[in-house]
């Protein structure tokens, strides 16, 4: 009897110790950039020593590619970003660094998530679409601010021609909405202050401690206030001669040269996607391209990624290979060059400066449409509309029985 009681107690103690050492569940984290901390949620899953971590981009999860917790030592890899979390787990706290050698390592800390009751405050309603006048290096004159709101809670994204900031999430406090975003690749803090004149004052702090201030007006009032329209992503980039077939000839990861004149593309509808594994908006877009390829490849759709990587990735494309594996990419992937070579490697394009950019080729090999950037799910209805328009475009091109030599 004493033996059985002792065995039960020992089992309970072992179980309690295992639970105390378990990371499983939601955690409240911060990552430090320069002199400010960005709060975020992270979720850990654990099976034995194996650990998986997931950051959040709105409702989307950004999961790790591998990880382990051995004794107090926690190591989690996000190979598709070429980043890692290295930390100790002790006394209920995860503490260490996150980052990589190229962009640096940043102090990281997390504690078990504590659900905070919704603030008993009446927040002003700012839901909807806003226009931000801004002159960008890409030639834009305005951006969009897309806001989704539930009471005092906000999820917002700034949508540029190349894509969005990711979901900036937070609550109304002290007369302003205090928001943050961290998905392992993008780090941002934002404050949105509603003004008496109906406008919004925005402070956005991002990578390398950059602080930018903007004013936003309701999109339906922008024209009357003299605020320009945001750039149309369908008009941002064009080709010099739309009557000429779109040409490419680059090596794939095995070293084999693949060209637009290959039999593989003859008489096919082709999506040519300018991309890079360093580009967060390209990560946003990849699952949609995979979905399109899976659905329409048998009907005559080919997708070709023209990938531009930094010199070190071109020598050792481990991040790119992890990117391809992460998203289950089976369409053609070509190493086109370095980001600085974009225009030289695709000389037919005019004003090609957005990552990603997607060219839609008809069965005759000619460019039928070009879309700059990718509005991700954080952009709400703009993401829904983009997916719908792209799908309809592909179906229309596939329905055209044009067969011409390239």
Predicted regions located by residue number:
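N-proximal helix/coil linker or "cap" segments that precede and/or mark the start of modular domains
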Residues: 206-251, 263-267
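Bacterial N-terminal signal peptides
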Residues: 6-15
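Short pre-active-site segment immediately N-terminal to redox-active cysteine/selenocysteine motifs
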Residues: 268-270, 275-278, 285, 310, ...
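Structural microenvironment flanking redox-active thiols in thiol-disulfide oxidoreductases
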Residues: 284-327, 339-346
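Thiol-/selenol-based redox modules, centered on thioredoxin-like
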Residues: 354-406
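Short, internal strand/loop/helix patches
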Residues: 249-251, 321-359, 363
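Central antiparallel beta-sheet cores of small beta-barrel/beta-sandwich binding domains
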Residues: 21-90, 98, 116-196
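A short beta-strand-turn-helix
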Residues: 248-270, 293-296
């Amino acid at each position: 009897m004493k033996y059985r009681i002792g065995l039960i107690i020992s089992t309970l103690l072992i179980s309690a110790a295992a639970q105390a050492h378990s990371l499983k569940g939601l955690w409240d984290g911060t990552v430090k950039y320069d002199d400010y901390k960005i709060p975020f949620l992270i979720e850990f899953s654990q099976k034995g020593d194996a650990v998986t971590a997931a950051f959040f981009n709105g409702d989307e999860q950004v999961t790790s590619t591998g990880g382990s917790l051995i004794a107090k030592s926690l190591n989690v890899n996000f190979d598709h970003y070429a980043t890692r979390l290295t930390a100790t787990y002790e006394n209920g706290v995860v503490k260490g660094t996150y980052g990589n050698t190229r962009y640096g390592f940043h102090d990281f800390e997390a504690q078990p998530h504590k659900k905070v009751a919704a603030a008993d405050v009446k927040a002003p309603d700012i839901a909807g679409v806003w226009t931000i006048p801004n002159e960008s290096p890409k030639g834009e004159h305005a951006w969009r601010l897309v806001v989704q709101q539930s009471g005092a809670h906000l999820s917002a994204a700034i949508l540029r021609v190349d894509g969005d900031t990711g979901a900036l999430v937070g609550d109304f406090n002290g007369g302003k909405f205090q928001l943050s975003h961290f998905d392992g690749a993008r780090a941002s803090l934002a404050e949105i202050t509603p003004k008496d004149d109906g406008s919004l004052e925005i402070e956005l702090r991002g990578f390398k401690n950059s602080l930018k201030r903007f004013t936003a007006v309701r999109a339906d009032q922008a024209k009357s206030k003299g605020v320009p329209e945001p750039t149309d992503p369908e008009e941002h980039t064009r080709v010099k001669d739309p009557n000429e077939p779109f040409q490419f000839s680059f090596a794939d990861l095995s070293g084999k040269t693949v060209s637009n004149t290959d039999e593989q593309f003859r008489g096919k509808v082709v999506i040519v996607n300018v991309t890079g594994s360093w580009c967060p908006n390209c990560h946003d877009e990849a699952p949609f391209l995979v979905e399109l390829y899976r659905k329409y490849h048998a009907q005559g759709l080919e997708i070709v990624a023209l990938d531009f990587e930094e010199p070190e990735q071109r020598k050792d494309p481990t991040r790119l290979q992890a990117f391809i594996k992460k998203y289950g990419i089976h369409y053609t992937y070509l190493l086109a060059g370095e980001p600085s070579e974009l225009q030289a490697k695709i000389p037919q394009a005019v004003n090609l400066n957005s990552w990603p950019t997607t060219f839609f080729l008809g069965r005759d090999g000619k460019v039928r449409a070009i879309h700059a950037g990718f509005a991700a799910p954080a952009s709400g209805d703009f993401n829904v509309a983009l997916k719908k328009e792209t799908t309809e475009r592909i179906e229309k091109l596939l329905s055209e029985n044009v067969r011409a030599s390239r």
